[in-house]
């Protein structure tokens, strides 16, 4: 209780994506990290659960004994929320697709590498990051298969972290094929590939909501009868 008031009911589900912590430099990233932590503090009183929809970090790779330097405040706040009993679900994005078992073991947070169905209050949700879904973007899809392959992860581990992280940061900011992102402009409902993906999924099964990130563009679009596609935007633009 606080000042004698009854405890707030935890009835809200929160979604966030594409924080890309780590870029363009530590100082700029720190500003966004502080804002994100403040937001987590605001929602912790009534959060039934929290979904992090990928690209929390602009780069993340787990060696057996090493994880990327930095992000201590963000990770500490996530640990605090988990210790308080709030469920958190993490979907890897195209920038943190090399997430291993660190979040699972350290925070007891399940990590998903593809869209997953959830049911809340009688509503069916399909939730994920959003990269590589729908038609088109074939170059990125081929690249993702290579990067996500266990052999690629094994090979990358042989790079010293100072070299591996610097190389990955360069690719992250310079190569659009790897980032898998278009310019952050609305392409129209017929051209937005996550809208097309949602409509095709509805041909075989009804979903009340599709929740994705990746596009860095907030959207809410009706994709069918009683079915809505929502994009969470980002924490950069």
Q: What are the language-model segments listed below?
A:
Residues 58-82, 180-190, 194-210:
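N-terminal short leaders/motifs
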